[in-house]
């Protein structure tokens, strides 16, 4: 059964023209991981939230599994992971199964030129050293050493 939660000024019906007091249209955005077949939110923006500048080839972050049935004990030197400029390229997967992927990363730069969305999984980032700001629809979230950053699946963000 559908559950509705109203926050702020919204139209009486969904998916209709909705204008502010000056007659300007609000932009409607559907936020969901499975479209209308799942739980979703309709968000209304004063300004258009996105503008597609270009569509690039899909970027896979799926790990390459070197030893699919490996049960050997291992010791990892996480603070010695090689630093790389790009956030996505810097992620090195250590362990993976059908439910979870554990990676280490040492990005040198922030994601200034792009936003990223993981459409298939939630992300949890533990910050061992450093800090920054995550920009998303939820606002700007500052993080620092010792923080966990939880990013729900389908969230468009920039670090």
Predicted regions and their residues:
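An N-terminus-focused feature that recognizes amino-terminal "leader" regions
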Residues: 1-158
């Amino acid at each position: 059964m559908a559950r509705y939660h109203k926050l702020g000024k919204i139209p009486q019906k969904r998916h209709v023209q909705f204008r502010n007091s000056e007659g300007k249209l609000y932009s409607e955005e559907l936020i969901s991981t499975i479209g209308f077949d799942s739980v979703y939110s309709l968000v209304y923006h004063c300004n258009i939230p996105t503008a597609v500048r270009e569509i690039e080839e899909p970027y896979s972050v799926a790990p390459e599994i070197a030893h699919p049935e490996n049960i050997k004990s291992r010791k990892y030197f996480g603070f010695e992971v090689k630093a790389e400029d790009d956030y996505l390229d810097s992620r090195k997967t250590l362990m993976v199964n059908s439910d979870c992927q554990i990676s280490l990363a040492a990005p040198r730069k922030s994601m200034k030129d792009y936003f990223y969305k993981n459409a298939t999984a939630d992300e949890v980032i533990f910050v061992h050293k450093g800090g920054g700001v995550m920009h998303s629809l939820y606002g700007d979230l500052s993080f620092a050493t010792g923080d966990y950053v939880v990013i729900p699946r389908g969230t468009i963000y920039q670090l």
